[in-house]
């Protein structure tokens, strides 16, 4: 358990100390005991919002725990912070920006002001621009240089310009347009774009260059390679504008690349990359499904936003999930969090949420620039069930470090096949039950004896089959994965991350930690390309690695 943080306000410190004492008082509690003492626990610890139902009854928390967690949220100024974000206050203070990805999915007529200007007309204009473009592509009216309609769309971006749209496209596979296939290229590793282009036809391929500044190293490198491929395979300079569009705030750089200004979709400083799938960055989503489905995605997120804004903290899904995470991370010693979607189309959701969470709250100083004396962002990881059961679930059940888990399950499938979905659901429910209930040494021994094993052998083997149990989890269910529930699900985790950032007093909307690596990469690249370039500025290890690269590529000494 961590000491009381000195960088919190006085009221929050008191609440923190109360939780520290409560953690000590309940150290030997078992989740199962909470069920035995409260027959209505499942009903009391379940909540529905925006088409999602959260069962948080399998948590190491009782009513007193939740009261104290909500008190900490109140004392940390949670309600005021929520209102400030939605009002467009510049809560990203290190960059002097508002944080208004929520405005992108706000369908009301209520103005949202940035620097005194209502941004709603710009948002509506961008959606209308997307609508016109997507409609042309889907009707076969957007023609390539040879007069053929578009069949393949390649989205080139990285980080939030890549993960969010890709996750949404994959999750909404039942809603795909038949004649469009979306591909995603992000890595500067040349094999990424090379393998993507291998089976594409330049006559029928559209590229979307996704970069706010139009200077992102990886995105520009891949876009230039795509441009060269297009020209090499028969495309013309004159037809370039039919095959390349951009999502960027730097219209001039996009024009210099060869993209018509009217085919540059806007980005704004008040939308962070990891929160940008709701903007024109979501153009690949709209092209792969349609604008109606894209608007439903926005509507689902808006429904979760409305719940987050208006529900009391003790009945607020993002707040409860966020505060339970605080409980485990700061008071019970968990240092990671696993997200387990039991749906193959959500296979990459944990990767997107990993970025949203770890880039937002992986910070070591508070909003005043003072080093924090408490743990902040946890390690986020996970993958699709049931695959994980044959990999890392062993650690979840018997490892020496326990990890809180979120199970995510659509109750119905778009692709029924025999008993498959019932089998999937049974595994999902069984895993959360096993984490909570475990298996005692006595039960393990008796099972072995009942199976006909000798007493001596059963005594030897039983300890290896013990499952400690008392390991917490949430279960999130929805009727099905559709645009609305997907939007709500992603927004839920966005707001959960915000909640935790408020408690830790962080700026969850900058990412200065990624800049140093970019700077060093810019200085190392010339050393790899020019064998005469000095490596004296590098540390000995890095200099040796540069020399090894040179030799491997026939240019070293």
Curated annotation (Swiss-Prot):
It catalyses: alpha-D-glucose 6-phosphate = beta-D-fructose 6-phosphate. Pathway: Carbohydrate biosynthesis; gluconeogenesis; Carbohydrate degradation; glycolysis; D-glyceraldehyde 3-phosphate and glycerone phosphate from D-glucose: step 2/4. GO terms for biological process: gluconeogenesis; glucose 6-phosphate metabolic process; glycolytic process. Pfam families: PGI (PF00342). Keywords: Cytoplasm, Gluconeogenesis, Glycolysis, Isomerase. CDD domains: SIS_PGI_1, SIS_PGI_2. InterPro entries: G6P_Isomerase, G6P_Isomerase_C, Phosphoglucose_isomerase_CS, SIS_dom_sf, SIS_PGI_1, SIS_PGI_2. It is an enzyme of class 5 (isomerase). GO terms for cellular component: cytosol. Belongs to the GPI family. HAMAP family: G6P_isomerase. Catalyzes the reversible isomerization of glucose-6-phosphate to fructose-6-phosphate. This is Glucose-6-phosphate isomerase. It comes from Hahella chejuensis (strain KCTC 2396). The lineage of its organism: Bacteria, Pseudomonadati, Pseudomonadota, Gammaproteobacteria, Oceanospirillales.
